[in-house]
């Protein structure tokens, strides 16, 4: 516990809040060629690289990821959720925030079923998270 004298000299400092998805908090004015501080829930971007990486220590897999250049000029690494994807270089994708715990440096997810990204095939449960349309009912 600080003394009164220490508080008079220094005072309490507020905790500095830091965004977990900073690339979504920057906009870009293409007419003035200046970045702006307008945040967005999602951003559009173009894939510059699509590949797989291995997760951190206790886990083992080949996780799919894409390197994406956003409309604000920032390049980020985004995770491709679901089984199978149709992305390749120059695909236009929509990204949202949300990290992948066992992939270092991956702070964004690609939204399935938006722009060039197809939804997951033959998915029946949790379809909205993977951009899958409702299956047609079987005729009797």
From Swiss-Prot:
3-methylthioaspartic acid PTM sites in chain numbering: 102
Family annotation (InterPro entries): NA-bd_OB-fold (IPR012340), Ribosomal_uS12 (IPR006032), Ribosomal_uS12_bac (IPR005679)
GO molecular function: rRNA binding; structural constituent of ribosome; tRNA binding
Role summary: With S4 and S5 plays an important role in translational accuracy.
Pfam families: Ribosom_S12_S23
UniProt keywords, alphabetically: Methylation, Ribonucleoprotein, Ribosomal protein, RNA-binding, rRNA-binding, tRNA-binding
NCBIfam families found in the cross-reference section: rpsL_bact
Membrane as UniProt keyword: no
Top-level lineage group: Bacteria
Name of this protein: Small ribosomal subunit protein uS12
GO cellular component: ribosome; small ribosomal subunit
Subunit architecture: Part of the 30S ribosomal subunit. Contacts proteins S8 and S17. May interact with IF1 in the 30S initiation complex.
GO annotation terms (biological process): translation
Family: Belongs to the universal ribosomal protein uS12 family.
